[in-house]
């Protein structure tokens, strides 16, 4: 009965977003080195879920962004909508800026060397107060394989991350075809959202839609449980 309930919930969430929802705001959870173009909007729905014992769960995150130009977007993210109830539903509002690195942009245009920084005010919707998530990273593509590597740091407070934590974050994106990528990202933390390795694929669908399918592995039992990750995103 529990398994059926989770499957129904997942189908409802994704059927609604796939029909209304290509830039990529995150790899899986690590913010990507892509930014929404000026005048365009981005919407992405993520579901982390596990339908088997022990501990079946559903956890949803909704990402949105609007490009304002100057390599910057304004963002709003709804975190921690889940079953069983998380008691930590939080709205994050802020920005992300993606800057080509001066001196390298013109010399190595195909390497896409970039510096990304962003921050969100985390406003708990369940009486957990107000906090912050701030992050920055460097990224670039390797010759020949065109693999994009990302490495940086993240600091987030208890409203989303369980405790106040500063952690390493990294990602790998490997193009296979023009539409298909192998992707992985990792947060090095020991609590909740800040402590998972997620690996899988992304696929560019028609009409500016992108599908992501992956599997998450927690750094420890305090971070949560293993399970599947699905995302749909769309640029408007």
Each model region followed by its residue ranges:
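Transmembrane beta-barrel domains of Gram-negative outer membranes and organellar outer membranes
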Residues: 22-160, 175-236
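Positively charged n-region of N-terminal signal peptides that target proteins for export
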Residues: 1-5
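Active-site rim beta-loop-alpha module in soluble metabolic enzymes
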Residues: 171
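Bacterial N-terminal signal peptides
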Residues: 8-17
């Amino acid at each position: 009965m529990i398994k059926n309930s989770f499957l129904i919930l997942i189908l409802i969430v994704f059927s609604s977003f796939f029909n209304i929802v290509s830039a990529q705001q995150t790899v899986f959870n690590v913010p990507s080195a892509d930014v929404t173009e000026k005048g365009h909007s981005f919407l992405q729905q993520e579901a982390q879920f596990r339908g088997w014992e022990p501990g079946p769960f559903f956890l949803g995150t909704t990402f949105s962004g609007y490009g304002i130009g100057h390599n910057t977007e304004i963002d709003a993210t709804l975190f921690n909508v889940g079953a069983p109830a998380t008691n930590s539903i939080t709205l994050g509002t802020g920005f992300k800026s993606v800057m080509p690195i001066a001196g390298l942009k013109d010399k190595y245009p195909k390497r896409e060397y970039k510096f990304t920084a962003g921050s969100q005010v985390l406003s708990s919707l369940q009486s957990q107060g107000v906090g912050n998530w701030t992050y920055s990273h460097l990224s670039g593509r390797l010759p020949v394989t065109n693999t994009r590597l990302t490495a940086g740091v993240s600091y987030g407070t208890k409203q989303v991350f369980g405790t106040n934590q500063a952690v390493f974050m990294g990602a790998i994106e490997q193009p296979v075809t023009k539409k298909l990528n192998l992707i992985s990202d990792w947060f090095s933390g020991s609590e909740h959202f800040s402590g998972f390795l997620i690996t899988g694929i992304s696929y560019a669908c028609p009409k500016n839609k992108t599908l992501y399918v992956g599997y998450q592995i927690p750094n420890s039992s305090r971070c949560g449980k293993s399970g599947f990750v699905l995302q749909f995103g769309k640029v408007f």
